[in-house]
Design a protein with these regions (language model features):
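N-terminal non-catalytic cap/leader segment that marks the start of a structured domain
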Residues: 1-103, 271
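A generic local secondary-structure boundary/capping motif
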Residues: 4, 60-62, 93-96, 110, ...
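Catalytic-pocket segment enriched in acidic/His residues
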Residues: 9, 49-53, 80, 166-285
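Residue "hotspots" at secondary-structure boundaries inside conserved domains
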Residues: 61-63, 69, 98, 128-130, ...
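Structural signature of FAD isoalloxazine-binding scaffolds in flavoprotein oxidoreductases
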Residues: 88-115, 132, 265-276
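Flexible glycine-rich active-site/ligand-binding loops centered on an Asp-His dyad
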Residues: 91, 98-101, 105-108, 151-177, ...
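Short, structured patches in soluble enzyme cores that scaffold and shape functional sites
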Residues: 108-110, 117, 124, 132-136, ...
């Protein structure tokens, strides 16, 4: 199943995409208003649905206000791990020469989330080195702690796409990554959230275009740490909750991997596409 969160008649609603036509949306009755309500309900979705056309709504992030922010995994594609460590921007204690021995985990606050089509402020008063990162993100569907790898997929509800926008100068200057990762608007998310049956984790393409130029192109088969491994490690002594979102890392081809580095500028358009999840597109000012 494929869900979107929308604004319709001045109300935030969550909708189910019609299987035969993604432009035909079934609004789930209130009080359901975001994907979190769908995840909490499990299989008990209310009916009947009110059907509308996608042109009659504004698409929002699947979860416009995450309960606990977003957990993110850094340097989880081998080629990106190498390009980042060689870029001169990694001054953190996680600095590696080839790939990390354990998942590198950081977070983005909920205020960083914006939806598809949102115009992202480059915040020049705070940073001059804004970079893009295409990522597949995983939604957790039930509480769990100390989750074994072999059971981890039982805790996954589904997936979405995010752009883990990063202020590279702040990431380098402060060594820990939080201040470079969680600026306002620096986590575009969407356009939809899909259940696990829609995505083949062993073979899902992740791409990113900047102004129609292909910059990132990889497959989830290239992940250093798999989704089950990531969930197992994060849940060690830490209870994951329904609606928690885990971004799985970005492929090679980010701006700092270019020679010279190519950072985003006003007027740029970034288009992230993940197979069977959709296209997340945002412009920058």
């Amino acid at each position: 199943m494929r869900f979107v969160t929308v604004r319709h008649d001045d109300h935030q609603r969550v909708a189910l995409e019609a299987e035969s036509d993604p432009h035909h949306l079934g609004l789930i009755p209130l009080p359901f208003s975001s994907l979190l309500d769908v995840i909490d309900a499990g299989n008990a979705l209310p009916s009947p649905l009110e059907w509308v056309n996608v042109s009659d709504v504004q698409l929002l992030a699947p979860v416009p206000s995450p309960r606990r922010g977003i957990l993110c995994v850094g340097m989880n594609y081998r080629a990106h791990s190498l390009e980042f460590s060689q870029s001169g921007f990694d001054s953190s204690s996680s600095k590696v020469t080839e790939h990390p021995d354990f998942p590198i985990v950081f977070s983005k606050f909920g205020a960083s989330v914006v939806g598809p089509g949102a115009i992202v402020d480059l915040l020049p008063q705070a940073t001059s080195q804004v970079d893009y990162e295409a990522e597949l993100a995983v939604f957790i569907k039930k509480p769990g702690r100390d989750i074994p790898i072999e059971e981890a997929m039982n805790f996954v509800w589904g997936y979405t796409a995010i752009n883990d926008i990063t202020a590279r100068d702040r990431q380098k200057r402060h060594q820990q990554w939080l201040l470079g990762k969680t600026l306002d608007g620096f986590c575009p998310m969407g356009p939809r959230a899909v259940t696990t049956d829609e995505v083949d984790l062993a073979n899902t393409r992740v791409t990113c275009h900047v102004n129609d130029e292909l910059r990132q192109d990889a497959n989830t088969s290239d992940l250093i740490f798999s989704v089950p491994e990531i969930i197992s490690v994060i849940s060690e002594g830490f209870t994951l909750q329904p609606g928690d979102l885990i971004a799985t890392g970005t492929p090679a081809g980010v701006g700092i991997g270019q020679d010279p580095p190519r950072f985003l500028k006003a007027g740029d358009q970034v288009r992230i596409e993940i197979s069977n999840v959709g296209v997340l597109e945002n412009s920058f000012k």
